């Protein structure tokens, strides 16, 4: 697990605010050793729970994690964008269209200097070697990104990146060494050209 560091200490020179927009189950956060308010929605069981790199990085910065309660109140998004997967497993979260979820992320981002959202349904589809899951996840992501890009204001930037490949080759269960795109929109458009 990750060792909680407590509240973030303000640095006199930064004054910037970041948000990790993913809303997690309380049980998952507690299994990682992170503080989370509310009752756990389910038992994690005996399986080993590992934190993603994004989770580790955000925790290291002292950020407060969002829970499914935040997703219910429109202050966070489930990892599948819409909430449909969590709802299908019995979670009390709303199901939103990708465009509505994008609007929520845009609103949340405008309250912060940096907003991060992690979508890993394509990774799970790749590990499962499921073309059906891959196509559905990519269609949902496409609708979400189209709305995000359309909703960018003149001072907004959006960077879309992946940490590795795998959904592009469903003959493998593992990550690939294929080049991954880094896309920039709005103010970020000219800043990602040099990324190789």
Label each PLM-derived region with a short phrase:
Residues 174-196:
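Substrate-binding rim/cap in mid-to-C-terminal beta-strand-loop elements of soluble/periplasmic
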Residues 1-113, 119-125:
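His/Asp/Glu-rich, glycine-adjacent segments
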Residues 155, 161, 194:
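C-terminal catalytic subdomain
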Residues 149, 169-171:
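Basic/polar, cationic surfaces and motifs that engage anionic cell-wall
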Residues 103, 115, 123-158:
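A long, amphipathic alpha-helix that forms part
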Residues 163-167:
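Active-site metal-binding loops of divalent metal-dependent hydrolases
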